[in-house]
């Protein structure tokens, strides 16, 4: 399986987590996903009254230097960590 297919598979797996990831984890995933699928940020930073959009933009901007492959790989790693954490908490 290629990196792109693995990435797409993990993008689906993350939707099936029974417990919602923390906001921090969601922002990390968002930034990596956008970097992997869109590339570097091309929009201006949202205003201070759009806190949610601003946080998402900041998360994307934070990974701006990563290549598509790096972002995909990091996204897969993060999803695996979340899946493992969920599995270990379910078995505990």
Curated annotation (Swiss-Prot):
The keyword Calcium is assigned to this record: no
One Gene Ontology molecular-function label: fatty-acyl-CoA binding
Keyword Cell cycle: no
Ligand binding (an acyl-CoA): 30-34, 56, 75
Superkingdom field: Eukaryota
SUPFAM superfamilies from the UniProt entry: Acyl-CoA binding protein (SSF47027)
Keyword annotations: Lipid-binding, Transport
Pfam families in UniProt: ACBP
Record-annotated ACB domain positions: 3-88
Family according to the record: Belongs to the ACBP family.
Job description of the protein: Binds medium- and long-chain acyl-CoA esters with very high affinity and may function as an intracellular carrier of acyl-CoA esters.
Protein name: Acyl-CoA-binding protein
């Amino acid at each position: 399986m290629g990196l792109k297919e693995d990435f797409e598979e993990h993008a689906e797996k993350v939707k099936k987590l029974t417990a919602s990831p923390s906001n921090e984890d969601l922002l990390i995933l968002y930034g990596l996903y956008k970097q992997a699928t869109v590339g570097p940020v091309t929009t201006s930073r949202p205003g201070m009254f759009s806190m949610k959009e601003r946080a998402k933009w900041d998360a994307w901007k934070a990974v701006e230097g990563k290549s598509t492959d790096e972002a995909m790989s990091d996204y897969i790693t993060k999803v695996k960590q979340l899946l493992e954490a969920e599995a270990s908490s379910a078995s505990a």
